[in-house]
């Protein structure tokens, strides 16, 4: 397997339509930003300030459902990585966008969290756009209470050839830990994330996050069966 190492660096350069880590995704207008629906249960309180109960003494709740955005990780311009993909697993053109519920590992509160092991479900989204329009614009998303952008400052991405088992951010790596490979035979890491103190990105004491996919699914551009593994030492 030909692993592709990823290096990121702060920049003042315009990254619209380019590969970049963090920042805002340049999604085409017809591609919606991925959200997860969250249901909150709130205890009903009476005029006396005490929880309201039914005839059997059970507390009464009301449910509120709202959308929670996934964290944007990066977008990869396929032309940047195609020369390094010797096995032809990745598309040759277009843009690939990565989103996941990783706020917890960035030291932030969030009602959603990526699974530690197994099927990623709706907590990971990979969006591939083959024909990218010329008029891309960064997606606009702000916190309701402050009006500030939810996105971190964007960093430029550079790519290079790497060993099969990467020790850095990477694409197409093969996890070397038995705890990751044994429950996921035949999977590779479409994206591997390592800890970075600059972003307060930590996987407990020390670890890695693997967003896993079968090579055949990747060739078919099928991202519905992604798995994830948070490995910690």
Which residues make up each language-model segment?
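Preference for intrinsically disordered or flexible, low-complexity segments
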Residues: 1-233
């Amino acid at each position: 397997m030909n692993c592709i190492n990823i290096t990121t660096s702060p920049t003042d350069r315009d990254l619209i339509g380019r590969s970049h880590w963090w920042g805002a995704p340049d999604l085409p207008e017809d591609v919606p930003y991925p959200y997860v629906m969250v249901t909150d249960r709130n205890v009903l309180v009476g005029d006396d300030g005490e929880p309201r109960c039914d005839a059997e003494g059970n507390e009464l709740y009301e449910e509120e459902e709202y959308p929670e955005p996934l964290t944007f990780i990066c977008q990869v311009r396929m032309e940047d990585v195609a020369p390094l993909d010797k096995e032809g697993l990745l598309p040759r053109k277009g843009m690939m966008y990565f989103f996941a519920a990783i706020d917890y590992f960035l030291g932030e509160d969030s009602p959603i969290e990526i699974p530690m092991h197994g099927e990623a479900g709706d907590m990971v989204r990979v969006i591939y756009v083959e024909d990218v329009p010329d008029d891309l614009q960064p997606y606009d998303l702000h916190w309701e209470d402050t009006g500030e952008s939810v996105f971190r400052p964007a960093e430029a991405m550079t790519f290079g050839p790497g060993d099969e088992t990467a020790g850095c951010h990477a694409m197409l790596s093969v996890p070397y830990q038995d705890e990751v490979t044994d429950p996921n035979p035949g999977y590779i890491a479409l994206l591997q994330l390592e800890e970075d103190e600059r972003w307060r990105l930590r996987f407990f004491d020390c670890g890695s996050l693997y967003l896993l996919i079968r090579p055949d699914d990747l060739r078919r551009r099928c991202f519905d069966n992604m798995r994830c593994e948070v490995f910690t030492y």
